[in-house]
UniProtKB/Swiss-Prot annotation:
The record marks 28 as: Transition state stabilizer. One of its GO terms (cellular component) is cytosol. Keywords: ATP-binding, Carbohydrate metabolism, Cytoplasm, Galactose metabolism, Kinase, Magnesium, Metal-binding, Nucleotide-binding, Transferase. Mg(2+) binds at residues 130, 162. One of its GO terms (biological process) is galactose metabolic process. This is Galactokinase. Its EC number is 2.7.1.6. The active site is at 174 (proton acceptor). PANTHER family: GALACTOKINASE-RELATED (PTHR10457:SF7), MEVALONATE KINASE/GALACTOKINASE (PTHR10457). Belongs to the GHMP kinase family. GalK subfamily. It comes from Shigella boydii serotype 4 (strain Sb227). It holds the Pfam family GHMP_kinases_N.
Length: 382
């Protein structure tokens, strides 16, 4: 049973009438451009065919009823006439409440809604299940009430909800790609202007995501430290962000910087350049060059930004040994565990899966999870 059929069926059972619309918003994987988002740089994600699906219908009052199919059909209910505050027990409900609350601040011309939510974006794998939920809820209200909001505004609304209502710091990439993703394309995003450019993906290439299942413990504290180090670097160059520093300017004075800050800055500057070049390599179907750029990105994250762990490095090495120069592989996400992403010719996927199954657990004691994805369409009706 598809997520659409599942949510429509649950909706009719729970609320006693059929849903009028079914909306989806996808998760994402970032192909290249790591920790560049909060430095006003470039990222190159694609939406994936794992998504959050919501069957819904407008109400003729100001009540919102939401059922979470993946949390034992828990039901949340709140009114648009009262101040929206956090739910005491249901964390999932706060993503919904936050999106609705921030949407009210943007455009209050919507009424009540009934929703049933289900998704298959793996949680805790760094594939943006939360952004996919935020964008899905925003799209529901935009579609049901014909709100004059574009994808970028729905994305910004989701980011605000996560930062200010849920209380998690995040950049804008995850929500933007979920809202604006294009089938068979990646999206080059300028995190300063929020400008986007669709980049066609070569035919016959699979997007493979492998979760190391190494439990991330340092990610919060280390993320904040990296952010501070980047801000220190920008201040040294008297620029608003590292986006504004050239590699030539850096090389001329690198010896004057604190050695650790210098390494962090070098990663951001080289990663930005790699990301822009990767977009044109992909567009030209040059998988060999894309693979080189992904390998350089991984080495930079390992040696300069120091956010990989041995388990992730092992996983990347196993994949690289199979694909050679026919594709690319690197860690993706915040670091200290999580996933690797690989661009692999479809005919090599079984060999990669077999090599990883035979070697990764033997070397690390952890069993991986393997996802084969397609670059998918952003949020909309399904």
């Amino acid at each position: 049973m598809s997520l659409k059929e599942k949510t429509q069926s649950l909706f009719a059972n729970a609320f006693g009438y059929p849903a009028t619309h079914t909306i989806q918003a996808p998760g994402r994987v970032n192909l290249i451009g790591e920790h560049t988002d909060y430095n006003d740089g470039f990222v190159l994600p694609c939406a994936i065919d794992y998504q959050t699906v919501i069957s819904c219908a407008p109400r003729d009052d100001r009540k919102v009823r939401v059922m979470a199919a993946d949390y034992e059909n828990q039901l949340d209910e709140f009114s648009l006439n009262a101040p929206i505050v956090a739910h005491e027990n249901y964390q999932w409900a706060n993503y919904v409440r936050g999106v609705v609350k921030h949407l009210q601040l943007r455009n209050n011309s919507f009424g009540g809604v009934d929703m049933v939510i289900s998704g298959n974006v793996p949680q805790g794998a760094g594939l943006s299940s939360s952004a996919s939920l935020e964008v899905a809820v925003g799209t529901v209200l935009q579609q049901l009430y014909h709100l004059p909001l574009d994808g970028a505004q729905i994305a910004l609304n989701g980011q605000e909800a996560e930062n200010q209502f849920v209380g998690c710091n995040c950049g804008i990439m995850d929500q933007l790609i979920s809202a604006l993703g294009k089938k068979d394309h990646a999206l080059l995003i300028d995190c300063r202007s929020l400008g986007t450019k669709a980049v066609s993906m070569p035919k016959g290439v699979a997007v493979v995501i492998i979760n190391s299942n190494f439990k991330r413990t340092l990610v919060g504290s280390e993320y904040n430290t990296r952010r501070e180090q980047c801000e220190t670097g920008a201040r040294f160059f008297q620029q608003p962000a590292l986006r504004d520093v050239t590699i030539e300017e850096f090389n001329a004075v690198a010896h004057e910087l604190d050695p650790i800050v210098a390494k962090r800055v070098r990663h951001i500057l080289t990663e930005n350049a790699r990301t822009v070049e990767a977009a044109s390599a992909l567009e030209q179907g040059d998988l060999k060059r894309m693979g080189e750029l992904m390998a350089e990105s991984h080495a930079s994250m390992r040696d300069d930004f120091e956010i990989t762990v041995p388990q992730i490095d092992t996983l990347a090495e196993i994949v690289k040994a199979v694909i050679g120069d026919k594709g690319g592989v690197r860690m993706t996400g915040g670091g200290f565990g999580g996933c690797i992403v690989a661009l692999i010719p479809e005919e090599l996927v079984p060999a990669v899966q077999q090599a990883v199954a035979e070697q990764y657990e033997a070397k690390t004691g952890i069993k991986e999870t393997f996802y084969v994805c397609k670059p998918s369409q952003g949020a909309g009706q399904c």
